[in-house]
Amino acid sequence: MRPYDIAKPFLFSLPAETANKSVHRLLETVDGTRVADVMADRYTVADERLAVEAFGHTFDNPVGVAAGFDKNATIPETLASLGFGFAEVGGVTAEPQAGNARPRMFRLKADEAIINRMGLNNDGAIVIGERLKNVDAPFPVGVNIAKTEHVGTNEAPDDYRTTYEHVAEGGDFFVVNVSCPNSEGFEELQNRDAMEAILSELQDAGAAPLLVKLSPDLPEPAVEDALDLVTELDLDGVVATNTTTERPASLRSPNAVETGGLSGKPIENQATEMVRFVAERVDVPVVGVGGVSTAEGAYRKIRAGASLVQLYTGLVYRGPSIAREINSGLRDLLAEDGFDSVEDAVGADL
């Protein structure tokens, strides 16, 4: 039995957000200690076959932590000790935000899923930017940039630029979040003109590498418009996808009635197909997100065109050994299929 199997019943007896904060505090306390070194020895899978080159950075392995887990950039180094290949912090907004009223995070235990309507609560770009300057993580750290809640569509480009300028020094890559389902005003940002204005403003500010994060709920023509922009503006990558407001009929948990973005196992196949759709249409690295919790699931996304994968909900349900388990499994799957590296397997099913 893994230690997390012992701790999980207690954590799951707490409200989801309370448990999340408790885990964060624990991870913060081990940062820079001998415990972090022991964790790194235990959880890191060192194998050159897992390494990936993407948007100008080397990732020791393709498994990262998605935005939303480390909102305020307080634990990147500790996440590296858990064996992850990178982390994306945020979403970060120009001003501090309290987010939506609680409760705002719900476990769907029977479905291995989460619904959240957090509302982009974060410490704000000034505080997080200063914090990022002091981060000394041994892996690439991305910054998810989002719109401040009270800012309208016309003012959004300047708002995103302000956030970027505060976090620029501490980020290794930047993800433009125009697809958050839990904050007002994001739907309008996903039309072509609004998205182009935001992305162009960030490029004018020097934001690079620059990626855009898309919603799984966009109709196909809107996704194609967004991907046309990726090519026209010469962006560096695409993150596919965000959480979904849709509710599959297969959901069994009582909390399925809650509003917010759904993440976890129920959206795994939908997210993988979105990765495939994107990878078939653009010639930039794709970061696959949605329902990743096993080596097999990560491998399906990689074969569908993802150069990297991210997870959040899987960490909640599977615990701190998840990166090691996925990376160990990926190593075996690559060998079984005769691939010399993860990079060789990217897009194998296209």
From Swiss-Prot:
Record GO cellular component, one term: plasma membrane
Name of the coding gene: pyrD
Pfam families on file: DHO_dh
Keywords assigned: Cell membrane, Flavoprotein, FMN, Membrane, Oxidoreductase, Pyrimidine biosynthesis
EC number(s) reported in the record: 1.3.5.2
Record function comment: Catalyzes the conversion of dihydroorotate to orotate with quinone as electron acceptor.
PROSITE patterns found in the cross-reference section: DHODEHASE_1 (PS00911), DHODEHASE_2 (PS00912)
UniProt enzyme class: oxidoreductase
Membrane disposition: Peripheral membrane protein
Active site residues according to the UniProt entry: 180 (nucleophile)
Region: Disordered, residue numbers: 245-265
PANTHER family per record: DIHYDROOROTATE DEHYDROGENASE (QUINONE), MITOCHONDRIAL, DIHYDROOROTATE DEHYDROGENASE (QUINONE), MITOCHONDRIAL-RELATED
Assigned protein family: Belongs to the dihydroorotate dehydrogenase family. Type 2 subfamily.
Name of protein: Dihydroorotate dehydrogenase (quinone)
Cofactor(s) needed by this chain: FMN
Record note on cofactor: Binds 1 FMN per subunit.
Subunit and partners: Monomer.
GO molecular function terms noted in the UniProt entry: dihydroorotate dehydrogenase (quinone) activity
Subcellular location: Cell membrane
The organism of origin for this protein: Haloarcula marismortui (strain ATCC 43049 / DSM 3752 / JCM 8966 / VKM B-1809)
Swiss-Prot/TrEMBL GO biological process terms: 'de novo' pyrimidine nucleobase biosynthetic process; 'de novo' UMP biosynthetic process
Positions bound to substrate: 71, 116-120, 177, 182, 242-243
Reactions catalysed, as given in the entry: (S)-dihydroorotate + a quinone = orotate + a quinol
Pathway field: Pyrimidine metabolism; UMP biosynthesis via de novo pathway; orotate from (S)-dihydroorotate (quinone route): step 1/1
